[in-house]
Curated annotation (Swiss-Prot):
Keywords: Ribonucleoprotein, Ribosomal protein
Gene3D superfamilies: 1.10.287.3980
GO MF terms held by the record: structural constituent of ribosome
Organismal lineage: Bacteria, Pseudomonadati, Pseudomonadota, Gammaproteobacteria, Alteromonadales
Species this chain originates from: Shewanella baltica (strain OS155 / ATCC BAA-1091)
GO terms under cellular component: ribonucleoprotein complex; ribosome
UniProt-listed PANTHER family: LARGE RIBOSOMAL SUBUNIT PROTEIN BL34M, MITOCHONDRIAL RIBOSOMAL PROTEIN 34 FAMILY MEMBER
InterPro entries in alphabetical order: Ribosomal_bL34, Ribosomal_bL34_CS
Name of the molecule in the record: Large ribosomal subunit protein bL34
Biased composition (Polar residues): 1-10
């Protein structure tokens, strides 16, 4: 039996998908801009 691939960790989640991580790169800022334009309630993890 193989283990499940998703092993939740809030720290890793925030570091890779959090708001600060998004703001750190140009691509991430574009992601936030797209999500704002779409009207998302939550912009990032």
């Amino acid at each position: 039996m193989s283990k499940r691939t998703f092993q939740p960790s809030n720290l890793k989640r925030k570091r890779s998908h959090g708001f600060r991580a998004r703001m750190a790169t140009v691509g991430g800022r574009k992601v936030l801009a797209r999500r704002r334009a779409k009207g998302r309630a939550r912009l990032s993890a």
